[in-house]
């Protein structure tokens, strides 16, 4: 059910991010500064790419949102660990943690809104196939505008709630490695 997806993606995924920030980083800072942190960053980048590629070919609206969420959480984890590795090696500020908190909050709002909109669309069109959901702006223009605003926030367009956190996380990954 959609409510379960909203709960899992909007709140429960953020519990893992909180656990990493609150417990894992303070308990094992030296391991994260070494090869373990780099392995997590590489796996996170692989998760970002995998989630984005599967989301791009997906036609099921809930599946698309779920894999997009996987990609966002991969970015959050990559930003946290990249910033932690840079902090351990150079003593710079830990901005990835700040970006992770901001992005977790923004992503929680956006993904709950997307799942809610997907449920409304499913009830209207009786399908989750996005190829069969044309003409929404003609029948429900206010809903189409709201859906577009939520989509823009989820993609991290400037002047939306998803931009600030994504920018900070991408900056921390870029500080760690200019190629990634």
Language-model features: locations:
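Hydrophobic transmembrane alpha-helices and their helix-loop junctions in integral membrane proteins
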Residues: 1-180
């Amino acid at each position: 059910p959609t409510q379960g997806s909203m709960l899992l993606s909007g709140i429960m995924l953020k519990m893992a991010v909180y656990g990493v920030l609150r417990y894992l980083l303070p308990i094992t800072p030296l391991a994260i500064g070494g090869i373990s942190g780099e392995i997590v960053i590489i796996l996170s980048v692989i998760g970002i790419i995998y989630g984005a590629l599967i989301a791009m070919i997906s036609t099921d609206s809930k599946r698309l949102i779920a894999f997009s969420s996987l990609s966002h959480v991969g970015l959050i984890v990559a930003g946290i660990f990249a910033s932690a590795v840079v902090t351990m090696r150079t003593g710079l500020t830990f901005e990835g943690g700040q970006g992770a908190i901001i992005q977790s909050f923004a992503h929680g709002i956006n993904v709950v809104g997307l799942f809610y909109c997907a449920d409304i669309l499913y009830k209207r069109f009786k399908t989750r196939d996005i190829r069969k959901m044309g003409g929404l702006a003609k029948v429900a223009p206010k809903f189409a505008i709201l859906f577009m605003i939520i989509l823009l926030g989820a993609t991290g367009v400037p002047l939306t709630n998803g931009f600030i956190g994504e920018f900070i996380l991408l900056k921390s990954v870029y500080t760690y490695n200019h190629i990634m």
